[in-house]
Amino acid sequence: MNCLEGPGKTCGPLASEEELVSACQLEKEEENEGEEEEEEEDEEDLDPDLDPDLEEEENDLGDPAVLGAVHNTQRALLSSPGVKAPGMLGMSLASLHFLWQTLDYLSPIPFWPTFPSTSSPAQHFGPRLPSPDPTLFCSLLTSWPPRFSHLTQLHPRHQRILQQQQHSQTPSPPAKKPWSQQPDPYANLMTRKEKDWVIKVQMVQLQSAKPRLDDYYYQEYYQKLEKKQADEELLGRRNRVESLKLVTPYIPKAEAYESVVRIEGSLGQVAVSTCFSPRRAIDAVPHGTQEQDIEAASSQRLRVLYRIEKMFLQLLEIEEGWKYRPPPPCFSEQQSNQVEKLFQTLKTQEQNNLEEAADGFLQVLSVRKGKALVARLLPFLPQDQAVTILLAITHHLPLLVRRDVADQALQMLFKPLGKCISHLTLHELLQGLQGLTLLPPGSSERPVTVVLQNQFGISLLYALLSHGEQLVSLHSSLEEPNSDHTAWTDMVVLIAWEIAQMPTASLAEPLAFPSNLLPLFCHHVDKQLVQQLEARMEFAWIY
């Protein structure tokens, strides 16, 4: 429906059909209830003595003329069964009552004492204001949320209808998910006691004797939280309230008790009765285990270290005695006895055969302190004893090189041994180098290959070859070639071939490079092999 704004003019929809139907229903209900009820309610609303709030509003109006106009307007509206106006479309008493209440609420709209009609002109109080637009008036009735004034009391049914309309206009809450409306079939399956028992079992798993280690992040987080709460309490921002903390139940752990009796070396579980009344042990040959082997090796190493310490004490006495005396061989008989005793301790150590003696000597050289002992002892030894140690080191050079990978301490022996090399004969030299050229059984690699990859090994080998070339050149001018010369030639050719076959990067850099080494190879090998040897030796010497 549309409301009219003067002749031939229309405005927007006044109200929806639901609102008009509600108004008509309300009018019929009010006519059936009787006029007496309405008059009593109207008198109560207009009686200033019964309503103290009405007096306050009348006092707020202030002007007697305005106050009289308000009273006249209310009485006219309540006494007339219906008001007919060009813009009202025959609205009922209750509808006009509600309309007047709405206009009373709207502060921007000026107060109208009477509704305009064609016969009676509109009366204005105060300054003349432009008449409101009926379109705005109609839209306000439907869109503006109603606020009820204390000057008017709505009928209970009318109030209920308005409340229903308000609820229908408010947006409905989002629909719940269909599965949330269904009852949980697994609810209340456990009693409170059973739940507490399950929680206790779960909390027991959180127990720890070392919380800082087992639950570090939770402990750090809770300490920071407690510090923050303490700071807030000091600043007065927070009341002292005990915060929640994870408390695990304390359950004392039973001491570990092992009822099974274990006997070392027994097979399987031993019965308790056997412990109290043991049977005769089975005669069996004991077999060493890996742990026993480790213990034996450890004890043997301790014995070697003890040997070295004892020999070092003897060596310190010798060095202290020769400090202010002339060097050997000008020493007394007592000093010679001390050196001889130390040499025998180093060489034999009460071994019955040569293999055991050599093994004891190698054990001393396998320790860094043992290498230092031999290096400091060599200058005090006689010539024959020093040569004996030199030949032993040369014969077992591959083994010593492998054991020196971690320490790299064999270099301290090169200078003392270099002085001993000059005392070697050609026959002794061939005996020392023979162990480097023999091919071990079950191996395709000669020991000299390992020696060439170590700095001390290749330096000692070059020094021995240089001294052998000097000896051969001296003997060749005096005597005819013999078996030692032939063996020496074969030895040089074999070593030269091994050097030529080895990659240049694998060849170690020597501590000293003899000047007569390349002429030595030129005398015994062909020119092509000499060129290969020269290239490798120069590369190794440069880098």
From Swiss-Prot:
Subcellular location: Cytoplasm; Nucleus
Tissues with expression: Highly expressed in oocytes.
Ranges for region Disordered: 24-60, 159-186
GO cellular component: cytoplasm; nucleus; P-body
Composition-biased stretches (Low complexity): 161-170
Main location: cytoplasm
Biased composition regions of type Acidic residues, renumbered to the chain: 28-60
Superkingdom assignment: Eukaryota
Function text: RNA-binding protein that acts as a translational repressor.
Annotated disease: Oocyte/zygote/embryo maturation arrest 4: An autosomal recessive infertility disorder characterized by oocyte maturation arrest that can occur at different stages of maturation. Some oocytes exhibit maturation arrest at the germinal vesicle stage and others at the metaphase I stage. Oocytes progressing to polar body I either undergo fertilization failure or, in those that are fertilized, early embryonic arrest.
Family of the protein in this entry: Belongs to the PAT1 family.
Record's protein name: Protein PAT1 homolog 2
Organism this protein belongs to: Homo sapiens (Human)
